[in-house]
A protein has these predicted regions:
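Residues located in well-ordered beta-strands
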Residues: 169, 181, 195, 244-246
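Non-catalytic connector elements of ABC transporters
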Residues: 202-314
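ABC ATPase nucleotide-binding domain signature
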Residues: 8, 15-19, 24, 113, ...
Length: 314
């Protein structure tokens, strides 16, 4: 697109700061891009423009499109208000409306929800998802919020230091991360990690336990064993193959609970269980930790792991 003038790219931006005209009403803010694109400088004059037949017809078309967009965003009741008289959510919807009314080929949204409080962010996120489904317009949405990205995206591109590390569907990123940074980025709220020295051979020896991790088989170097809190379970301490852990503390999160357990190898792991079961545990209790070897990952110290499939690149 470098050779295409910005005015000819047919892109619409939505900014974090809204960038609304403070002296214009919500209606005029939404209509602004249409007025600038479809009316000449003479036709935009309040008195003379009203006398020109072509301008009258185009103004009628602009009004129709603004009101259609307003209805879609549920802004009809505030069209006559200026930005200072609008709530944060209403301002954000006006900014969305200003981008949508043009019907561009691509939307570019740069953290448009960052200035909203938590409840309003979730509500507006749902509205954006609904609008995207109804309009079907390609949208590039920049965010540092993992939950926001997963909720809104068909595909996510994860970047670190200006470099794209992985592109995939949200579920595939969570299930099959390309490297440790991607796995950490999608950790909600925790990722269990354990440094492992190589060579690995036929499995990982952790304390008195032998763990077979398919990713690690045959590795000639060390790295990091990683797994999510839901990919391990607390079992009887004498279960074969289980790591020995001791309950340090418990955090409750609604119907779930997170158990922080100190392992014999000097690491602390976090395991997700039901809140009901957590009530039967006590601090200092000795238990076994059974890691799901099919869902754990081994990340070599020299870079990306060998993923189990390459559907992320399709």
């Amino acid at each position: 697109m470098d050779a295409v003038a910005p005015k000819d790219r047919d892109l619409a931006f939505v900014f974090q700061s809204y960038a609304l005209y403070p002296h214009l009403s919500a209606y005029d803010n939404i209509a602004a891009p249409l007025i600038m694109r479809e009316l000449t400088s003479v036709e935009r004059l309040p008195v003379i423009g009203a006398l020109l037949p072509g301008a009258v017809q185009r103004n009628r078309s602009i009004d129709e499109r603004v009101r259609q967009t307003s209805a879609l965003l549920k802004l009809d009741a505030v069209l006559d208000r200026r930005p200072a008289a609008l709530s944060g959510g209403q301002r954000q919807r006006v900014a969305l409306g200003r981008a949508m009314v043009r019907k561009p080929k691509i939307f570019l949204m740069d953290e448009p929800l960052a200035n909203l409080d938590a409840a309003l962010r979730i509500h507006t996120r749902s509205e954006i998802a609904r609008l995207h489904k109804e309009m079907g317009t390609t949208t590039l949405f920049v965010t540092h919020d993992q939950a926001e990205a997963a909720a809104l995206s068909d595909r996510i591109a994860i970047m670190f230091g200006g470099e794209i590390r992985q592109v995939a569907k949200p579920a595939d990123l969570y299930r099959d991360p390309a490297d440790l940074d991607v796995a950490r980025f999608l950790a909600q709220p925790f990722l269990n990690e354990l440094a492992v020295t190589g060579p690995i051979g036929g499995g990982l020896t952790v304390g008195n336990s032998r763990i077979i991790i398919r990713d690690a088989l045959g590795s000639r170097e060390g790295g990091t064993l990683a797994f999510r809190p839901e990919h391990a379970s607390l079992v009887c301490p004498d279960q074969p193959g289980a790591l020995q852990v001791q309950v340090a503390r418990i955090e409750y999160a609604g119907t779930d609970a997170y158990v922080f357990a100190d392992a014999e190898v000097g690491a602390q792991f976090v395991i997700r269980i039901t809140a009901e079961r957590a009530q039967s545990l006590r601090g200092g209790e000795s238990l076994g930790l059974d890691i799901d070897s099919e869902k754990a990952w081994f990340f070599p110290s020299n870079g990306s792991r060998q993923r189990r499939d390459h559907s992320w690149a399709a």
